[in-house]
Amino acid sequence: MIEDDMMNYTDDGVPESVFNAFGWDDPVVTTIAAGHINQTFRVALGERNQHLCVLQRVNPIFGPAVHYDIDAVTCHLQSRGLVTPRLIRTTKDELWFLDEFGALWRAMTWVDGENHTSAESPELCYEAGKLVAGFHLAVRDFKYKFRNERLGVHDITAHLKRLAEALDEKDYHRLYGEVAPLAEEVQNRLGKLPSLEGLPSRIVHGDLKISNLMFSPEGEGVCLIDLDTLAYMSVPVELGDAFRSWCNPTGESSADSEFSTGHYAEALRGYVAGGGSWISAEEIEAIPTGIETITLELSARFLTDALLESYFNWDRKNFSGAGEHNLYRAKSQLSLARSLSGKRDELRNITQEIFTRGD
């Protein structure tokens, strides 16, 4: 039976039915290693392989309905003159294809550019901020009800509840002695931060790690990719998650993370230069809090996952278990949160100065 199933796959692990669904003859398929969620391929078509597109096997955490959202938002972005990948319909005029094995596939137009795994320089942060501001500005007045709702993604109360439950249920876990005091610190720090509730809910990308931004070879922002996470959210939460990632030069895999105010200032300058100054005064004021809140939220989530041994991308080469890897990630984020805590006044001053001056 296994041999029969494999007969339907190409050398790249793509069922022939997928190529047929999109009407592709003799495609040249190359695996793109970047990304942990969806399996991504570069497809070259035509006699000289001159026509390129992206093919993705969509992770089961996303249902087919997400493609209605991607199509609607990218259509709007295109109408506003922004560069964006667009979904390619099947020969049956559908936005996705479900293969005979139950896997969900989609194809998208190819956008020339490159991405980065980390923000190596303040200059890159400037271009990233400018690109994100253009996106936020373009969807500012777009009225749309998402079919794929991402509920509880940044629900701090829910994440802390899960952490408390994990501590109660896993007190026998080999890492409990290390996790418990860190969890207490996370809870105490979060309890002292201003609430982000009540801020305007706006359409956002939802996952602005630097690898989800495309740049030209000259370093200019081109477009946002990986649009499965489109949702309504507050801008300080969106930017908080972005700046948490961009402004950590040591990378998220470092145990001793330090927040770079230089990277932050350039990211904000880029955001303002890209048209981001339209957000409200309360949103501007909440940006530094958003960074610290999301950093602590991730710490809580990783501590929970350490006790639950939950990590689909566990690095078996460097960690003896998923728990150990998650504990390392939690320590990295908590280190970053401590750095942020010590720079609150500086971050607040930088934020107000840049938005006031409009630079």
PLM feature spans:
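Active-site catalytic-loop/activation-segment of kinase and kinase-like phosphoryl-transfer enzymes
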Residues: 2-6, 148-194
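Juxta-kinase regulatory segment immediately upstream of eukaryotic protein kinase catalytic domains
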Residues: 2-30
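Conserved ATP-binding subdomain of kinase catalytic cores across diverse folds
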Residues: 31-46, 50-53, 58-161, 235, ...
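Active-site acidic catalytic loop and adjacent metal/ATP-binding pocket
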Residues: 36-50, 54-55, 87, 188-237, ...
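Secondary-structure capping and boundary motifs in well-ordered enzyme cores
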Residues: 100, 124, 200, 205, ...
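ATP/Mg2+ or Mg2+-diphosphate-binding catalytic cores
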Residues: 166, 297-359
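Active-site activation/catalytic loop segments of kinase-like enzymes and analogous catalytic loops
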Residues: 236-277, 293-313
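Small/polar glycine-rich anion-binding or flexible loop at a beta-alpha turn
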Residues: 284-294, 320
